[in-house]
Amino acid sequence: MVFSTIIFLFRFLPITLALYYLAPAKLKNTVLFLCSLVFYCWGEVRFFPVMVALILINYISGLCIEHFDQKPALRRTFLLIALIGSLGMLFYFKYANFVLRSANALLGTAFAEIQGIGTLPLGISFYTFQTLSYSIDVYRRDVKAERNIIDFGAYVVMFPQLIAGPIVKYRDVSNQLHVYRHRYSLQQLEEGMTLFTFGLAKKVLLADAIGALWTDIIGVADSPSTTFVGLANASTPLVWLGIIAYSLQLYFDFSGYSMMGIGMGKMLGFDFPANFNYPYISASITEFWRRWHMTLSGWFREYVYIPLGGNRKGLKRQIFNLFVVELLTGIWHGANWNFICWGLYYFVLLAVEKLFLLPHLQKGKVWPHIYTLFLVVVGWAMFVGNDTGVSFGLLFQKLFIPSGGVSPLYFLRNYGVLLVVSILCCTPLIEKIWNLLKKNAVTRCAAILALLVVSTAYVVGSTNSPFLYFNF
């Protein structure tokens, strides 16, 4: 089920909120757990056993880790069970056939692919990392093991952040899970509705609209557009315009989903961590990764980079640790070589900055922003290079070897205003304007209501457009 659909906006969300608010205090987590399971099973009920297994493995492992507190060997054994169980399911569904295909291509073997896997369980990369963080934190004694399986299940399967984040650590919400009274307030409800509305607007008014420009240029086979060009016919300037549009689409799509999730969390009385902080205003690649998908970066920093030694064991070890993290970041995003190359690309950029470039970037004013945006956009070209209708080699040939073809002028005339608005929305300017407007209650309510009505009208009048990060 997608947030930006009629069935979610007009049926699932209002019914769930009504049941949740009306439920007795001690049953709220039960209502949240059951409604979230309905949400998860709506599209692919066959993956219900996967979710149940993941919950049980980590729930039981957490209890056993805590129970055998004075027996280190048993604690490590149950942590290993949680890690192997969680990562094993992720590997089976997401990476097994990729490994088999790669082995066949590289080694000349003839391993048969696993039949019946089909589509990837929605959000498996996100909720697997959540359960891993829980089991590791219990092992580290950072949190107490959750003894109520319903409360633990509600944490794992909580629908606002289940499918595409933000990645929420158990310790971020453990107190809120157990505060049955006064969990939410009218102020929280208003803040949540505001965030949800802004996120919905990002998705349907910006991401989907600017994404149409990219679709018109590459000309995917199932595109409803009759004006698409096709990558082979596009000129180099037009391809650059298209990849810039894709960069904007990806940001608004993913940050919009995260904002909607954070907003719904507030409606339910939970404070989820922020996931984006205007990444396209960054003045270095290092800063970009502090602003983009912050919960994923934070997860790798806490559970991989620091345990490997972080910055504490010399420069060579620091670079190696960075290599491991960026490689895993690429692999996390997808079972394909372009994602691995994308991760290694960022490793090289981050290593160069760490070795010598960062001090020079910190002295600059304008050129560091240009440098960062250029490299990020090139990275997104690598990222999208495996999508349907996109030839990785042809895309980079068009980007870096000047070629003629269809001019971008037609598309600039049609999408120029949208491009300008989208670029402005990548900066804190809109937030500053909103901070001025929201001081007046009437203006604040009118603005949110108008934005919600317009966004909802677009949802009603458009076809279903899934979030891009559902693929990961």
Where are these regions (language model features)?
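Membrane-embedded transmembrane alpha-helical bundles that form the catalytic cores
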Residues: 1-471
